[in-house]
Amino acid sequence: MKITILETSDIHAYVSTKSFTNPNKYENHSLSKVKTYIDEIKRENENVIYIDNGDSIQGSPLGTFYKNNNDLKNLAYVYNLLNPDAVILGNHDFNYGQDYLKSYINYLYAPVLSANTIDKNSFLDIRPYIIKNIENIKIGILGLTTQYIPHWERPENIKGLSFKSALETAKYYLPILKNEEKCDIVIVSYHGGFAKDIETGLELTAQTGENEGYELLYSNLDFDVFLTGHAHKEISGIYNNIAVAQPGFAASKVSEITLY
């Protein structure tokens, strides 16, 4: 059986190809182009899982326009057209406050995941993981978010929330997915990047805990696919026997992983 996994990340509300600064110019990146590509993949392949890895609603002039005009329903409508199987929370998804984020989550058709975001008031409809069944194959999708959000975000935007280590959270949930849920394939979708070189382990940035990708990848935890983001890098390859991807930002690329 062939299973195709698609990932977008850090779209930052770049919906249209039309330039925000020049009305006569069209960009090479946009959700409209992403949708065309995803639709093509789905036409050509029977078993496709598509995950958006977060930072969806903030970052472009259009995102600001939607916020200022309280027009979130139309932005969510665009994302629903892509029909993701799961959406992960990114750090910038908290920038406009929890009421705005809650509305976005409620408008989405897809489940929203972040296992290490702890909501003591249960205000946001978020889950740690979901399970997809494709014929006789059971696929677990675990969502994780960078734990560093309190260092950036306004306190009023994350009131009642706490953010745990992605690594420590994965240590808890991955055995559940493999041993209790009996998943054949486990995908970890982490809105975070790598603070160490993915091959050599050399430190690239300060080891603050913002980006736990390297630690997750080499943790000896049992998972098969590692989708990353946050750092706006392009990563594609097999590392430590795990398929790893990161698709850049602003809807410029789509990561594609094929499992047989």
PLM feature spans:
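Acidic, metal/ion-coordinating pockets
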Residues: 1-260
